[in-house]
């Protein structure tokens, strides 16, 4: 080894030792007859002292920031009053006898700890990863992964690898396709998840499986998504919903406790899907902001206000929420901004009033009676604001109000976004309508066990034995009890519009396995990137991934995706069409 110690290791007890340190030059200070170097590696920082009479003194003239050097010297205590309590090695310094330049650095486009635009950080990721923030996040990610592995190992789970080159089963997002050179015209797909393989492992008798695995989705990247991501994949045989939730809560609570000293309240709260949509307008609720959605229909039963009357006469709904202490912010201009936002979200507009020395509203002339009833029923206080909307589509109304609630919470009540709001959303509908495909699709995936009592030809009534873990408004995990009976699986395919021939073509290998003994089983997958980002306090998962892609799926470090050699394309019998 070139070094005897790391830059975060030496203490006062090491005084007098001859040591060799290697690292990056973080800072250089020249105080005349003595020069100081702050030498840094991933373990910490050590102050190097170069006296004017030492051979090391002149070498400092050649050094630049971020050069890599080897330092030989002797440990001594810092003079009294010069200790640095902000670093672990702050009691000591190393008096340099020799400095060897291992790699001289050119001027950098930016220096560790600086925060240029994200594109620059991703292009020069090797510089960005030297910062304390990124170092802390990457080490945290490793520790969380180790905690997870230890937890499942103690419970008797086996970590089993599943294939990356598999068959395309186009359900949900698009697959990344990999052409086969040996079988022209045939393609592998990179897995969106190991779903079928982990179920086959249950059929194979491996009753407790987990894997920290890369997954791939070729989808239009919404905010803070990655085309390749890491999930903690879990599957168990002979279990019901309670078993999966208990094991999951044990893992998540242990990760928080051992990685960050945070104790979560176990068991986690559970909210049925319908309740989440009614109260928060989303199946990923963040309850820290309060402001639950309320049904204000009771106040408008006899209203003559035309806009709302028409909605109610058509069977629609009137809902809204109270924003506490928001009156000082709620000017007419702010009201107009919120009204425009609701139109963007698909509603006709917004009605509002506030308690500000009495009821104040642009709509007071027409709705004073209704406003007073709401204020009394909801026990509104001076300074509160009530936001109200109406629509014939209750789902759209809930979603629009839920979005507005969250936007107001994040913009004006960020001080409430502390701690961790952890909950399960359960009792999901099995199907949802896809506008793009103009048909019902499985909300989770078509291998989820339905609640048998609800299984019939009415898509809207079928419920799934599915569950999502939500932390601070982010979906961190999702899973279900799986179908283990072939007749039920065929019924689900039928409801999804898959003919027997199509089902065999896509999933024949899987359905074949159903003939030979399938245990009841269930599982869950956690998004490791999201889990780490929440614990790290980062708003973007890119901050906890060593080499992430941009929002449009580009690796700025390597330039991927990129053109390939024409010869490679010919071997694969692929031709690129222009336009």
UniProtKB/Swiss-Prot annotation:
<dbReference type="InterPro" id="IPR029351">
    <property type="entry name" value="GAD_dom"/>
</dbReference>
<dbReference type="InterPro" id="IPR047090">
    <property type="entry name" value="AspRS_core"/>
</dbReference>
<dbReference type="GO" id="GO:0004815">
    <property type="term" value="F:aspartate-tRNA ligase activity"/>
</dbReference>
<keyword id="KW-0547">Nucleotide-binding</keyword>
<dbReference type="InterPro" id="IPR004365">
    <property type="entry name" value="NA-bd_OB_tRNA"/>
</dbReference>
<dbReference type="GO" id="GO:0005737">
    <property type="term" value="C:cytoplasm"/>
</dbReference>
<comment type="function">
    <text>Aspartyl-tRNA synthetase with relaxed tRNA specificity since it is able to aspartylate not only its cognate tRNA(Asp) but also tRNA(Asn). Reaction proceeds in two steps: L-aspartate is first activated by ATP to form Asp-AMP and then transferred to the acceptor end of tRNA(Asp/Asn).</text>
</comment>
<comment type="subunit">
    <text>Homodimer.</text>
</comment>
<dbReference type="Pfam" id="PF01336">
    <property type="entry name" value="tRNA_anti-codon"/>
</dbReference>
<keyword id="KW-0436">Ligase</keyword>
<feature type="region of interest" description="Aspartate">
    <location>
        <begin position="195"/>
        <end position="198"/>
    </location>
</feature>
<feature type="site" description="Important for tRNA non-discrimination">
    <location>
        <position position="81"/>
    </location>
</feature>
<dbReference type="InterPro" id="IPR045864">
    <property type="entry name" value="aa-tRNA-synth_II/BPL/LPL"/>
</dbReference>
<dbReference type="Pfam" id="PF00152">
    <property type="entry name" value="tRNA-synt_2"/>
</dbReference>
<dbReference type="GO" id="GO:0005524">
    <property type="term" value="F:ATP binding"/>
</dbReference>
<dbReference type="InterPro" id="IPR047089">
    <property type="entry name" value="Asp-tRNA-ligase_1_N"/>
</dbReference>
<dbReference type="InterPro" id="IPR004115">
    <property type="entry name" value="GAD-like_sf"/>
</dbReference>
<dbReference type="InterPro" id="IPR004524">
    <property type="entry name" value="Asp-tRNA-ligase_1"/>
</dbReference>
<feature type="binding site">
    <location>
        <position position="171"/>
    </location>
    <ligand>
        <name>L-aspartate</name>
    </ligand>
</feature>
<dbReference type="GO" id="GO:0050560">
    <property type="term" value="F:aspartate-tRNA(Asn) ligase activity"/>
</dbReference>
<feature type="binding site">
    <location>
        <begin position="527"/>
        <end position="530"/>
    </location>
    <ligand>
        <name>ATP</name>
    </ligand>
</feature>
<dbReference type="GO" id="GO:0003676">
    <property type="term" value="F:nucleic acid binding"/>
</dbReference>
<keyword id="KW-0067">ATP-binding</keyword>
<comment type="similarity">
    <text>Belongs to the class-II aminoacyl-tRNA synthetase family. Type 1 subfamily.</text>
</comment>
<feature type="binding site">
    <location>
        <position position="475"/>
    </location>
    <ligand>
        <name>ATP</name>
    </ligand>
</feature>
<dbReference type="Pfam" id="PF02938">
    <property type="entry name" value="GAD"/>
</dbReference>
<dbReference type="InterPro" id="IPR002312">
    <property type="entry name" value="Asp/Asn-tRNA-synth_IIb"/>
</dbReference>
<dbReference type="InterPro" id="IPR004364">
    <property type="entry name" value="Aa-tRNA-synt_II"/>
</dbReference>
<dbReference type="InterPro" id="IPR006195">
    <property type="entry name" value="aa-tRNA-synth_II"/>
</dbReference>
<keyword id="KW-0030">Aminoacyl-tRNA synthetase</keyword>
<feature type="binding site">
    <location>
        <position position="226"/>
    </location>
    <ligand>
        <name>ATP</name>
    </ligand>
</feature>
<keyword id="KW-0648">Protein biosynthesis</keyword>
<keyword id="KW-0963">Cytoplasm</keyword>
<feature type="binding site">
    <location>
        <position position="217"/>
    </location>
    <ligand>
        <name>L-aspartate</name>
    </ligand>
</feature>
<dbReference type="InterPro" id="IPR012340">
    <property type="entry name" value="NA-bd_OB-fold"/>
</dbReference>
<feature type="binding site">
    <location>
        <position position="444"/>
    </location>
    <ligand>
        <name>L-aspartate</name>
    </ligand>
</feature>
<feature type="binding site">
    <location>
        <position position="482"/>
    </location>
    <ligand>
        <name>L-aspartate</name>
    </ligand>
</feature>
<feature type="binding site">
    <location>
        <begin position="217"/>
        <end position="219"/>
    </location>
    <ligand>
        <name>ATP</name>
    </ligand>
</feature>
<dbReference type="GO" id="GO:0006422">
    <property type="term" value="P:aspartyl-tRNA aminoacylation"/>
</dbReference>
<protein>
    <recommendedName>
        <fullName>Aspartate--tRNA(Asp/Asn) ligase</fullName>
        <ecNumber>6.1.1.23</ecNumber>
    </recommendedName>
</protein>
């Amino acid at each position: 080894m070139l070094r005897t110690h790391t830059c975060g290791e030496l203490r006062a007890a090491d005084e007098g030792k001859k040591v060799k340190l290697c690292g990056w030059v973080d800072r250089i200070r020249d105080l005349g007859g003595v020069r100081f170097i702050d030498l840094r590696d991933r373990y910490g920082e050590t102050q190097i002292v170069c006296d004017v009479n030492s051979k090391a003194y002149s070498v400092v003239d050649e050094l630049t920031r971020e050069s890599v050097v080897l330092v030989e010297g002797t440990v001594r205590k810092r003079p009294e009053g010069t200790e640095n309590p902000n670093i672990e090695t702050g009691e000591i310094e190393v008096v340099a006898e020799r400095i060897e330049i291992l790699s001289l650095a050119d001027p950098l486009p930016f220096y560790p700890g600086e925060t240029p635009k994200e594109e620059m950080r991703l292009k020069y990721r090797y510089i960005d990863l030297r910062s304390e923030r990124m170092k802390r996040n990457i080490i945290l990610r490793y520790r969380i992964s180790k905690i997870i592995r230890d937890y499942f190992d103690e419970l008797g789970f086996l970590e089993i690898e599943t294939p990356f080159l598999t068959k395309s089963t186009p359900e949900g997002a698009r697959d990344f396709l990999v052409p086969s050179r040996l079988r022209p015209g045939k393609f592998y797909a990179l897995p969106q998840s190991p779903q079928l393989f982990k179920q086959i492992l249950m059929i194979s008798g491996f009753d407790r499986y987990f894997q920290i695995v890369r997954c791939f989705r070729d989808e239009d990247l919404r905010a803070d998504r990655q085309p390749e991501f890491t999930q903690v994949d879990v599957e168990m045989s002979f279990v019901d919903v309670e078993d999966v939730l208990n094991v999951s809560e044990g893992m998540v609570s242990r990760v928080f406790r051992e990685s960050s000293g945070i104790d979560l309240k176990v068991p986690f709260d559970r909210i049925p899907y319908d309740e989440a949509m009614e109260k928060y307008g989303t199946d990923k609720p963040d309850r820290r902001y309060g402001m639950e959605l309320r049904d204000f229909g009771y106040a408008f039963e006899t209203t003559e206000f035309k806009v709302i009357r028409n909605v109610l006469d058509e069977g629609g709904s009137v809902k809204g929420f109270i924003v506490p202490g928001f009156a000082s912010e709620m000017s007419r201009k702010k009201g107009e901004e919120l009204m425009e936002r609701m139109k963007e979200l698909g509603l006709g507009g917004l009605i509002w009033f506030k308690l500000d020395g009495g009821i104040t509203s642009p709509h007071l002339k027409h709705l004073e009676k209704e406003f007073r009833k709401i204020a009394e029923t909801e026990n509104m206080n001076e300074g509160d604001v009530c936001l109200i909307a109406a629509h014939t589509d209750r789902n759209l109304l809930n979603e629009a109000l839920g979005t507005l609630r969250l936007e107001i919470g994040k913009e004006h009540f960020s001080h409430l976004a502390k701690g961790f709001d952890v909950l399960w959303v359960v009792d999901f509908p099995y199907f949802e309508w896809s506008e793009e495909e103009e048909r019902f699709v499985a909300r989770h995936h078509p291998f989820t066990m339905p609640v048998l009592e609800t299984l019939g030809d009415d898509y809207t009534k079928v419920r799934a034995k599915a569950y999502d873990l939500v932390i601070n408004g982010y979906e961190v995990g999702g899973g279900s009890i799986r179908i283990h009976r072939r007749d039920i699986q065929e019924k689900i395919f039928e409801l999804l519009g898959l003919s027997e021939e199509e089902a065999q073509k896509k999933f024949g290998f899987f359905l074949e396995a159903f003939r030979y003994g399938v245990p009841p089983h269930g599982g869950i997958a956690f998004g490791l990137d999201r889990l780490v980002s929440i614990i790290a306090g980062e708003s973007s998962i890119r901050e906890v991934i060593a080499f992430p892609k941009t929002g449009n799926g580009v690796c700025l470090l390597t330039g991927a995706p990129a053109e390939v050699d024409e010869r490679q394309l010919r071997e694969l019998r692929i031709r690129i069409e222009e336009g």
